[in-house]
């Protein structure tokens, strides 16, 4: 099932999601919802409910995994499946590394949430380049093999950005302004 907003927020409480991760998830949801609404106007058949729930739940396991060392996207998928949220489990599972992305393919809810997550640093809208710099500084500084993985991941994200914005009436650098103007 696709969880309602109420269920998403109750699960955030149940899994003790810290306030800073909630703010991040809510900003990811705003971006993903704006992009989804605009893509639907352009004729794409995306589910706004699935995008909203997937964006809100994408980091459901982050604080747990900081303690246990587990991979938060995998643990998050497991949490979704345990709570019968199978329709968003793949979104949560692939919000860090997108599997089977085809640049020429139809855009999916999973790709929209993945992209939106890469545009938010903490709870602030940033460019992909700024987010990349932050991730390299935070995660790759001490673990050399992570730099190549992060760079590959962001190459996919740049392709995805081109695909998304080729269908929209504004540019990636205008995202924060469009969010403000439209009251997101």
Question: How would you describe each model-predicted region?
Answer:
Residues 1-68, 124:
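Acidic/His-rich, divalent-metal-binding segments that scaffold phosphate/diphosphate chemistry
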Residues 7, 132-135, 148, 152:
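Active-site helical microenvironments for divalent-metal-assisted chemistry
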Residues 11, 35-38, 79, 160, ...:
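Residues within well-ordered alpha helices
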Residues 41-142:
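Divalent metal-dependent catalytic cores for phosphoryl transfer on phosphate-bearing substrates
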């Amino acid at each position: 099932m696709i969880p309602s907003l109420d269920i998403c927020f109750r699960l955030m409480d149940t899994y003790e999601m810290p306030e800073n991760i909630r703010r991040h998830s809510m900003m990811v949801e705003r971006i993903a919802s704006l992009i989804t609404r605009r893509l639907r106007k352009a004729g794409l058949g995306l589910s706004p409910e699935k995008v909203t729930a997937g964006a809100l739940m994408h980091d459901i396991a982050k604080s747990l995994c900081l303690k246990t060392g587990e991979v938060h996207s995998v643990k998050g998928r497991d949490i979704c499946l345990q709570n019968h949220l199978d329709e968003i489990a793949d979104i949560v599972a692939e919000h860090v590394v997108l599997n089977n992305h085809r640049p020429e393919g139809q855009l999916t809810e999973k790709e929209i949430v993945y992209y939106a997550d890469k545009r938010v640093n903490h709870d602030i809208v940033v460019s992909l380049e700024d987010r990349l710099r932050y991730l390299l500084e935070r995660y790759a500084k001490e673990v050399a093999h992570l730099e190549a993985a992060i760079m590959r991941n962001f190459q996919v994200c740049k392709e995805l950005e081109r695909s998304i914005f080729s269908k929209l009436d504004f540019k990636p650098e205008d995202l924060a302004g469009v969010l403000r103007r439209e009251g997101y």
